[in-house]
Amino acid sequence: MQPYDIPTHGAEKRPAPGNGQLTQGIALNHLAIGYAVRQGSAHIVAQGLVAEAHPGQLTCLVGGNGVGKSTLLRTVAALQKPLKGCVSIDGQRTDVLSAAQRAQQVAVVLSATPQLPHTTIGRLVAMGRAPYTGFWGRLSEADHAACTEAMRQVGIEHLRHRLLDEVSDGERQKATIARALAQHTPAIVLDEPTAFLDYPSKAAVMALLRRLAVEGQRTVLLSTHDLGLALQLAHHLWVMTDGALVQGSPTQLAADGTLNRFIDSDLLSLDAASLTIQMKGVR
């Protein structure tokens, strides 16, 4: 079903490698994203998007402000419908799943940590079990074990009885990641999870997400403006610019000039050998 008549001009200038037909991981299949403005018409943010994110890898989505990163992640997470094409997770199209089924396929972490007064970290993490607990929300022994293991994996088990407003920003963000882990989904999507953290906390959270992807063989996809950290920690990059999406490893995208075109300015350049961003003319 294609409810919108989307023109083909302005599609991505350089298709990303891969055919978007993964049976494991996240696949974008000729995806168009945007918003319905009235019946039968839409505001198109980007279209013709083909990309893949693999289990056991940290995939980072980077791009300038306003290019549509959040819109893309919302579409991947099935928080809004695609205008055309589809998103698949482990071979299942997300747009044909029920809300309950989607909640068992993908967990979502947003940049703003939840504002939940009088809520403990343990209670927040337990919310990740909601897709499995039924109408009354009662936790079984298995649910409690899943929550404990999720908190252990991110290093906050000792904080389970602390209130959210009693811990640091980094600890709160780790709690939201633990909630996503407790949800037991094959994919986790995070929209700028380090946006409000100091630099050491940003690095710690990014390194944690990389480890969780590798050890749990999860597909972890996140957006970030911290390109320096993404270059050092991501296995795979999605670079979004001008309505197009290009994918590859940091090394590949540095070698073919994609990252230089994205980064290069009067002040900045990319050192492809070290995958570090350099300031020009600074002594």
Predicted regions span which residues?
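Conserved ABC ATPase signature
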Residues: L163-V167
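ABC ATPase nucleotide-binding domains
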Residues: I263-R283
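Helix-to-loop junction immediately C-terminal to a conserved catalytic motif
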Residues: A77
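Conserved ABC ATPase "signature" region
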Residues: A126, E141-L159
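Conserved ABC transporter NBD signature motif
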Residues: G85-R93, R102
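Catalytic Walker B motif of ABC-type/P-loop ATPase nucleotide-binding domains
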Residues: I188-D191
